[in-house]
């Protein structure tokens, strides 16, 4: 009985360990992972996950244009195919577009063939709208484990994560002022900031964006795209 209990305990600990490896934003089993830039330079990379949506893409682009700030948009391939005009607008405004998978399904327990299909289809969809810049990759939900890092490493592709995610830290009930205040005070040089702005229930995050930009600029921060982030 003790032996069975020990085996069960070991299996539980292994499962917990694998879960933590899959969720880590700072480490993966193989290949390159970037979650922040040079900590000695007051630069920050503003990144948005998911979408695009026609309504909110235009709103976000207007905010960025008003404050003359570049950003990196990690887009879902199937929505890129469905809403090419929104993607083209992002490209025309000079922002960077990243690959956030085609289906936005978790990629941790998938075959290499399935993973490559997701990557290739999304890259092709992004290129189809005329975007010619670099396409970085961020996994859906930040989940990785073994096969995804293996495929990315084999293809000489880097995993781009984040170092500051105010929505995750504060929860969904946080107000725009709370999100802005927290982000401005928590930001460190070289941070990669993650925000989700493309959903109807994220009004408070969109409302916080101008405050975040103004607050960080007042502290001397410069905004860059991921590909221009000093490492």
Mark where each language-model region is.
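Basic- and aromatic-lined ligand-binding clefts that recognize polyanionic substrates
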Residues: 128-152
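Terminal accessory/targeting
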Residues: 1-47, 62-72, 188-231
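Charged helix-capping and loop-helix junction motifs
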Residues: 116-119, 175-180, 207-210
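Alpha-helical scaffold elements within enzyme catalytic domains, especially in hydrolases
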Residues: 63, 89, 128, 151, ...
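Active-site beta->alpha N-cap acidic-glycine motif
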Residues: 22-110, 114, 118-125, 133-134
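His/Asp/Glu-enriched short active-site or ligand-binding loop at hydrolase and phosphoryl-transfer sites
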Residues: 143, 148-185, 220-231
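Short histidine/acidic/glycine/proline-rich micro-motifs that form metal-
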Residues: 77-80, 103-106, 142-143, 165-170, ...
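A cross-domain feature marking catalytic cores of carbohydrate-active enzymes
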Residues: 48, 75-77, 99-101, 139-141, ...
């Amino acid at each position: 009985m003790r032996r069975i209990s020990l085996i069960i305990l070991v299996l539980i600990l292994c499962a917990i360990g694998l879960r933590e490896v899959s969720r880590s934003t700072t480490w993966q089993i193989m290949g390159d992972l970037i979650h922040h830039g040079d900590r000695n330079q007051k630069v920050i990379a503003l990144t948005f996950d998911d979408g695009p949506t026609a309504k909110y893409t235009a709103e976000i682009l207007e905010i960025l244009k008003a404050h003359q700030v570049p950003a990196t948009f990690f887009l879902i391939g199937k929505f890129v195919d469905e809403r090419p005009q929104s993607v083209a607008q992002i490209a025309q405004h000079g922002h960077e577009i990243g690959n956030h998978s085609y289906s936005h399904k978790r990629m941790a327990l998938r075959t290499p063939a399935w993973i490559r299909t997701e990557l290739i289809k999304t890259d092709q969809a992004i290129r189809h709208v005329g975007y010619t810049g670099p396409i970085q990759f961020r996994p859906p939900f930040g989940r990785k484990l073994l096969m995804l890092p293996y495929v990315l490493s084999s293809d000489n592709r880097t995993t781009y994560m984040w170092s500051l995610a105010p929505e995750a830290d504060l929860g969904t009930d946080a107000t725009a002022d709370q999100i802005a205040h927290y982000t401005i005070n928590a930001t460190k040089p070289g941070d990669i900031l993650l925000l989700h702005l493309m959903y109807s229930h994220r009004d408070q995050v969109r409302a916080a964006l101008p405050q975040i930009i103004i607050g960080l600029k007042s502290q001397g921060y410069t905004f860059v795209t991921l590909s221009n982030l000093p490492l």
